[in-house]
A protein has these predicted regions:
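C-terminal motif of bacterial Sec signal peptides marking the signal peptidase cleavage site
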Residues: 22-25
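Subset-of-secretome marker
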Residues: 27-439, 444-449, 453-476, 497-498, ...
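A low-complexity, Ser/Thr/Gly/Pro-enriched, surface-exposed linker/loop concept
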Residues: 472-487
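Long, intrinsically disordered, low-complexity Ser/Thr/Pro-rich regulatory/activation regions
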Residues: 487-499
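Extracytoplasmic/periplasmic beta-strand context in beta-sandwich domains
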Residues: 526-528
Length: 537
């Protein structure tokens, strides 16, 4: 089942993205040059518009019988999702701004706005007490990933030429044109396609457009894919020309390699280095072999796994595409809808779904015109994204109004305030210990810090102090004593604080009670058990 799920999910993931290719790769119909349409679409640098993505899932409720009520409610919540983006302004590849909303079902929604430049992104969320900012400089982004940032080694490296945005864009356009001559021109027409004139509102203005409509089902997609691969394999001359063209572009722009800090493979000098002609032939041969292997793999699927193929790419899988093109061959409006009914065969079913629909819509105006996006500004009160990565769930909740929709979603639906700490009985470092009198003791520092509490040691009083911000609880204990002071009140615990291998251990049930948590034991395997302390704050 896992193997089939992997194959099925990969096929499904390609379907929607292929639809535009179906449209753009067609041979000219009704005097519309679709190859030019795609090339222009790939070269759009500025635009205004609006977009939406909608997902609807019809679950088989029988598959969820016995699930907790909270999980059922969450499944229903995500069964209908819509991301709506309005007032989208794309100034260039680095600067944009938009307003949007994430809609759950028919009523629940969270509004937001986003402003981005080449160095900064600022998002405001409805219900948030302050905006969230993300530093987009390379050093900051590397820091988020945990990759160390090293200083520039020498002046030579620091002086490395950088390609400006205009140069990179021009290079990209050249490569699109070169690759498109082979990859796009070999695209076959889908079987069902219609082209007719239409008048559609774009930004509220009635606009004369050419309407391209395509219908596809699973078997038609498979037929189209085989025809496309066959055409690519047959056009060896086109492949050779494409590869030679790409290599010519790369060889003619040595500053690209310098900007990347990579050795230019086209630089002459080494005696045994391959010639440019040899490199082109080697690359072209490798792609040709890959395409031939793909062609054989498609045939193999038809013979050895036809049942899965017929179930996944069945007539119950449909794609409808409506693309509206103006007289400049710019795409102004797009509507794509994918519908899928999973297999009724339990061995082939990948999810407990009765049906799935994905709908994508967009409108565009002022295409490649003068567009000015709103400029992001980081205020002093803004929360930086890197802070969120280290925040406990309860601290994240404090960034939102308790009466807001997003607070309710995070706390009561997604339960980000849930915390748990687990130990295996065979852990080599600070395992849970069951004492001879039957009391379970656990390491105090590990417990406190993983729950977000702060632990300190007072050398003068020799007291260990734990402050738990989530519950506003203060606990003071001493080594060797079974007395604890919880929020100023002295209580007796079931076992004295004990040092084991340098770590202070405390009775689990007592510390859990003081911190508003519960404890539990579960079997893992053979003689190994898992001890867990958990709470929701």
């Amino acid at each position: 089942v896992v193997k089939k799920f992997g194959r099925s999910s990969k096929l499904l993931a390609l379907l929607l993205s292929l639809t535009l290719v179906f449209v753009a790769g067609c041979q000219a119909i009704a005097n519309v040059d679709f190859n030019t349409v795609l090339n222009k679409a790939l070269k759009v640098t500025s635009t205004e518009g609006k977009q939406s993505i909608e997902l609807k899932m019809l679950f088989d409720e029988q598959a969820f019988v016995g699930l907790p009520e909270e999980e059922m409610a969450l499944m229903k919540l995500v069964s209908s999702l819509k991301l709506q983006l309005d007032n989208v302004k794309v100034q260039d590849s680095s600067n944009l701004s938009l307003n949007g909303s994430l809609i759950f079902g028919d009523a629940t929604s969270i509004k937001f706005s986003l402003k981005m430049s080449d160095t900064l992104a600022v998002m405001e969320l409805e219900g948030a007490k302050q905006p969230f900012v993300l530093d987009l400089t390379s050093e900051s982004l590397l820091g988020l990933t945990g990759i160390p940032v090293f200083p520039v080694a020498d002046e030579e490296t620091a002086a490395k030429p950088a390609l400006d945005e205009a140069s990179m864009t021009a290079l990209g356009h050249q490569i699109v044109d070169t690759v498109g001559a082979y990859a796009i021109n070999n695209l076959p027409n889908p079987e069902r396609i219609q082209v007719k004139p239409a008048i559609e509102p774009i930004n509220g203005i009635s606009t004369s457009l050419t309407h391209v409509h395509i219908d596809l089902d699973g078997p038609e997609i498979w037929t189209w894919l085989k025809k496309y691969v066959d055409a690519l394999v047959a056009d060896r001359a086109g492949l050779d020309k494409m590869v030679a063209g790409v290599f010519e572009i790369l060889a003619g722009n040595p500053e690209l390699w310098a900007a990347m800090g990579t050795v230019n493979p086209f630089t002459e000098g080494e005696l045994d280095a391959p010639t440019p002609e040899e490199m082109v032939k080697e690359a072209s041969d490798a792609i040709a072999v890959m395409l031939t292997e793909l062609q054989a793999e498609l045939k193999l699927v038809e013979t050895e796994d036809k049942e899965t193929l017929d179930e996944v790419l069945s007539k119950d899988l449909t794609i409808k595409a409506d693309v509206y093109i103006d007289n400049k061959l710019d795409i102004r409006k797009q509507v794509y809808e994918l519908s899928y009914v999973p297999s009724a065969n339990p061995e082939l079913a990948v999810l407990p779904l009765k049906g799935l629909t994905v709908k994508v819509e967009s409108e565009a105006w002022n295409v490649n015109g003068a567009v000015k996006a709103e400029v992001p500004v980081a205020t002093e009160s803004a929360i930086h994204a890197e802070q969120l990565f280290t925040m406990q769930g309860y601290k994240i909740l404090k960034q939102f109004d308790e009466k807001s929709t997003i607070y309710d979603l995070l706390k009561n639906k997604l339960h980000i305030g849930k915390q748990s700490v687990s130990w295996f009985t065979d852990d080599e470092y600070n395992p849970p210990i069951v004492t001879p009198v039957g009391v379970t003791i656990i390491p105090l520092r590990d417990t406190a810090e993983q729950l977000g509490a702060v632990i300190t040691y007072d050398k003068k009083t020799k007291g260990i102090k734990v402050f738990d911000e989530a519950t506003n609880t203060t606990i003071v204990v001493k080594i060797g004593s079974d007395k604890a002071v919880v929020n100023g009140k002295t209580v007796k615990w079931s076992f004295p604080v004990t040092v084991v291998d340098g770590a202070a251990y405390v009775p689990a049930r007592n510390i859990a009670s003081a911190l508003g948590a519960k404890i539990s034991w579960t079997e893992f395997y053979e003689d190994v058990k898992i001890f867990k302390i958990e709470r929701e704050v």
